[in-house]
Amino acid sequence: MEIESWWLLAIPLFFGLGWFAARLDLRSGGARPRGQLPEAYFRGLNFLLNEQPDKAIDAFVDVVRLDPETVELHFALGNLFRRRGETDRAIRVHLNLVERRDLDAQQREHALFELGQDYLKAGLLDRAEDAFNRLEGSRYAAAALHHRLELAQMVRDWPLAIGHAERLERDCGERHGRDIAHYRCEMAAAALAQGTPEGRAAARREIAAASAADPAHPRPPLLAGELALAEDDPAGAIAAWEPLVRESPSFLALAAGDWLAAHAAVGRFDAGLAALERVQAEHPAVDTFAAIADALARERGQEEALAWARAGLERQPSLLALERLLALHAPLADEARRGDIELMQRVVQPQARRLARYVCRHCGFKARQFYWQCPGCSRWDTYAPKRTEEIERG
């Protein structure tokens, strides 16, 4: 079994800890000859060099005594346990430090901060939150507040997350406008999903607050248009989305179908189509392609939609666009050709499904729907409004 790479970094650390342990032994008036290291240290180092990290740690634990001067050894071991995923052992080490009465305030705060990180990695969120809350007013307060913000996001407590983010802005001079806009939008989306007048009113307030937190963010106008449609106000939806055409045109792909439907509802389909085609020319997206083809089929008939889709496919070859073209072509084909088209659809569809996913640019998590926060790594704004095929094509 190959030694884990982080153990290569641990070896110099334990040489240093051995020197420290020898000094402690001398101070304590031990019977060993001057400069001799504790036997457990050599035993642990032997295990480490023989690629037996579990036994090595057990031996090094034997070196660590309750002498107040061995605090740094405790911290080193606890952090190594956590890095290896042995959160139970890390918790025991750091909890022991927190409960010791001979530590000064700074050492106890350090131990409490490490313990909070142990709990967080172990998924013990309530205990982690309690540990970080207890660091209020300490030198670890800012770092603990970052973890408290992380915890609030994990449990989707958006009002609490807003409070923590605003404190980081106020007390630490950090910028969290975009984060706060997302939290507000999450609250707006939940309120809108209620389908009630009260929910829509709450959504409107949160969307306005999100826009104030980050005026350049594309998410609030997208939600504002969705809210307008929920209130049967297509003109209001168009007004909400129009800034995207100028400021974040690629994100209009996420509302392309509704954009065209809203323009059709107010008798301005041609104007809406022309605007979306200009966006598509500069920022091609499969979702926009499909939205235009579907809207043309609905408003002007299958043949015009098919002609437009064929021309678009020639300009920008795409397997996903081909799948849409075949779907448009099938109803117009005679019975003999329809069988061939359906065969082509069966061949194309599996690969098209693979290419139709969105991809997180941070962790690579792939999803069939667009996410503002990646389900894999929990980071915000890591999905482009483009499918895998478009990203791979560059």
Where do the protein language model's features map onto the residues?
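Short coil turns that delineate tetratricopeptide repeat
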Residues: P68, D102, Q106, R139-Y140, ...
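Structural register within alpha-helical repeat arrays
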Residues: R43, L77, L115, R148, ...
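Start-of-helix register in tetratricopeptide repeats
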Residues: P38, E72, Q106-H110, A143, ...
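Alpha-helical segment of the N-proximal tetratricopeptide repeat
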Residues: P33-E69, A76, R82-E86, R92, ...
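Residue-level signature for tetratricopeptide repeat
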Residues: N46, L80, D118, L151, ...
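Structural motif corresponding to the intra-repeat A-B loop/turn of tetratricopeptide repeats
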Residues: N50, R84, A122, V155, ...
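Long, contiguous interaction/recruitment modules in multidomain scaffold/adaptor proteins
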Residues: M1-G35, N133, G137, A142-H146, ...
